[in-house]
Structure formats: structure tokens, C-alpha cells
Amino acid sequence: SRDNGPDGMEPEGVIESNWNEIVDSFDDMNLSESLLRGIYAYGFEKPSAIQQRAILPCIKGYDVIAQAQSGTGKTATFAISILQQIELDLKATQALVLAPTRELAQQIQKVVMALGDYMGASCHACIGGTNVRAEVQKLQMEAPHIIVGTPGRVFDMLNRRYLSPKYIKMFVLDEADEMLSRGFKDQIYDIFQKLNSNTQVVLLSATMPSDVLEVTKKFMRDPIRILVKKEELTLEGIRQFYINVEREEWKLDTLCDLYETLTITQAVIFINTRRKVDWLTEKMHARDFTVSAMHGDMDQKERDVIMREFRSGSSRVLITTDLLARGIDVQQVSLVINYDLPTNRENYIHRIGRGGRFGRKGVAINMVTEEDKRTLRDIETFYNTSIEEMPLNVADLI
């Protein structure tokens, strides 16, 4: 029946692509010289699957729905598309990006700024947990070309007219499924009402629940649909191991034994609950191991400091929860440890797929108790991948 969703899109299903053009080099995308410089300086060589497919229709001004997970290069896809379309001489906000978390919004802002480094484009992150007055002053002084933000704060700024929709020609919703599941639906609908009806809409989502389909149906015109399949998400190049710890209480000693190996590069350790993050951090500190920790109960300032230290390499081991798996994108991380296996298997790729993006090599180590064995097999089957017992010389692989 047609009421389930638009053509080619079933609720909770996988969308059907209706765009088959593939451009496999950034040079062939008709991008400006200064943008190309930024792309290559950022370390990209060849566009990823989603970039090969989605940048062109975005630049041509089509509404685009892309079904893709993090780790596929989706942020750069819309960042490049926005930067290509901005009129630099027009000192007005021309693109608006919404993201579900502050971390992700800041991450996107960093990518936009890095890629637009040689263009002089301005991009401001509009997020909760920061000083409203300072933000208002900034927006009033000079409207940034691009705003990236969380729905609540962005709507607030539009509503109070500190942010003008007049010249916004491109509206991007990143991780739309996450935003809607976090209860931002009303704010998102309100933001749509404030934008011009001819604003280009680009929507990215890992899954397509009915509330995401509703947005596409209500606010998008004849959208181009692009699917980047799960297997194009890289577990490739990532060596995955498990350690048989038998019992939960033996994980701590195992982690301490691994500590030397962790600090060869930078490592992220994933835990399933915030309280346990604090518990493990305390235990590690008590044994004189240096680790930093981050989770959703911390305030924004604290999280920023920790991320900064980790990005700069001054802190080497970060303990965190899934909430932040999507907001951590650290080039140097080549080791991920699942102290706890993820409670849902989709999160496995969010955790691991960061370690070795775009062919960067990485190692993932899963700590497995007796009870976890089934879950591990389940993950192997789901991703059609193999997870072997960790060899003794694991340090040589990192």
C-alpha cells in the first residue's frame, strides 16, 4: 500500500536507489580549485562510495535522501556540496545543517572548516550548553555562511530572529533517524516552516523508520535516493579479535595487561553504561594508569576539554559510551577495545568503523565472557566478518 512511505521506500526497510551516476575522482566533480585544495589537504585521495554518488546530485541542487551509516564519509559528502554552492561574497547564512548531538555538530563544523580552509567560508556551531548571549553577539556581528547545530538551539535562534532564513538555500539533516528518536520532531518541523519553500533538502539516515519517511514525504520534492550498503561501511582493513575473559571481574586485569599495547597509538575503550565508565576510570587511576573518560552526564565544557586533549594526542586512552561513538572521529585511533560488547549489534560498526576509516588500518579487541559468546557470533554473522582469538603478538599489528 502507498501509505507506508514514498515510492522506493518502505518503513524500516532499505531504500531503492534511483541515481546511478558514479564519479570516482574529486577532480571530475566540477569543484572549485580552492575547495579541491582543501579536500586533498584534509587527506582524502579518492571519494568513498557515498561521495562518488551523492556529491553530484547535491551540487546540482536536487533534494537527496542518502541511507548511510557513519564511517562512510557522509559528513564530507554534504560539507563538500555546501562549500561548492556557497557564494562567499554574500555575507549571509546560506546553509543549515542539523545533527542529533553537540559532539556531532562540532565534528561537522570542524570538517567544514578544514575542507573550506582555502576558501574563507565561515561556519558556526549552534549548540545547547553554550552561552546564548555570546552566540547572539556572534550571529549579529556577521552572519556565518554555514550554521551547524542541534535542533533546539537552531530553532531558538531562528525563532528569535538572530538567524535569518532569507538566504538559506540548502538544509541538511544528518542522522535523521537519531534526531527523530531523540524527540526533536517538533523542532525540526518548526524549522522547516521557517525556511523558504524552495530550499534544497538533503537528508542522511542510517535507518528509515516511518517518522523519517514522513519528513521525506512532507518536505522533499522528487528526491534522489541513494543507498550505501552496509558492506561499503568499512570493517575492511580492521583486524578483529576477541579475548576470552570468562568472567566479568577478570576484564579489569586483562585491560591493565593490555595497557602498554594501548598506548602505542591512541585507543578508545567502549563501555555500556555511564556509571561503569566512571567505575573503570577510577579503577585504572587507582592502579596508576593514565586514562581519560567521557560520557553524557558530563557538561559540555568538560567534554570539549577531554576531546581536545584526545584529538591532540596528549591523552592516549579514552573510555566512553555508545552515545559518543558517533561523535568521535580521531584520525590516529587505530585500536578500539570493546570492554563490553555493544547491547545492539548495529553499534558495533559505529565503534569499530571509526578505528580504520577509508582503508586506514585498525585493530579491534572484544572482551568476551561466557555469556557474551553468542552475541559475538551474532555480530560475526550480522556483518559477515570473522573475529579471531587475539594472538600474543598483537602489539606488532597496531
Swiss-Prot record:
Enzyme Commission numbers on file: 3.6.4.13
One annotated GO molecular function: RNA helicase activity
Motif (Q motif) on chain: 24-52
PROSITE patterns per the UniProt record, alphabetical: DEAD_ATP_HELICASE, HELICASE_ATP_BIND_1, HELICASE_CTER, Q_MOTIF
Modified residues annotated as N6-acetyllysine in this record: K110, K166, K185, K230
Catalyzed reactions per annotation: ATP + H2O = ADP + phosphate + H(+)
Residue stretches making up the Helicase ATP-binding domain: 55-226
Superkingdom classification of source: Eukaryota
One GO BP annotation of this record: positive regulation of transcription by RNA polymerase II
Motif DEAD box in this chain: 174-177
Covalent crosslink: Glycyl lysine isopeptide (Lys-Gly) (interchain with G-Cter in SUMO2): K138, K217, K230, K301, K361, K373
A GO CC annotation given for this chain: cytoplasmic stress granule
Modified residues (Phosphothreonine): T150
UniProt KW keywords: Acetylation, ATP-binding, Cell membrane, Cytoplasm, Helicase, Hydrolase, Initiation factor, Isopeptide bond, Membrane, Nucleotide-binding, Phosphoprotein, Protein biosynthesis, RNA-binding, Ubl conjugation
Binding site for ATP: A68, Q69, S70, G71, T72, G73, K74, T75
Compartment(s) of residence: Cytoplasm, Perinuclear region; Cell membrane; Cytoplasm, Stress granule
Boundaries of every Helicase C-terminal domain copy: 237-398
InterPro entries: DEAD/DEAH_box_helicase_dom, EIF4A_DEADc, Helicase_ATP-bd, Helicase_C-like, P-loop_NTPase, RNA-helicase_DEAD-box_CS, RNA_helicase_DEAD_Q_motif
Pfam annotation, one family: DEAD
Assembly, per entry: eIF4F is a multi-subunit complex, the composition of which varies with external and internal environmental conditions. It is composed of at least EIF4A, EIF4E and EIF4G1/EIF4G3. Interacts with PAIP1, EIF4E and UPF2. Found in a complex with XPO7, EIF4A1, ARHGAP1, VPS26A, VPS29, VPS35 and SFN. May interact with NOM1. Interacts with PDCD4; this interferes with the interaction between EIF4A and EIF4G. Interacts with RBM4. Interacts with DDX3X in an RNA-independent manner.
Homology family: Belongs to the DEAD box helicase family. eIF4A subfamily.
Protein role: ATP-dependent RNA helicase which is a subunit of the eIF4F complex involved in cap recognition and is required for mRNA binding to ribosome. In the current model of translation initiation, eIF4A unwinds RNA secondary structures in the 5'-UTR of mRNAs which is necessary to allow efficient binding of the small ribosomal subunit, and subsequent scanning for the initiator codon. As a result, promotes cell proliferation and growth.
Protein name: Eukaryotic initiation factor 4A-I
Provenance organism: Oryctolagus cuniculus (Rabbit)
Gene: EIF4A1
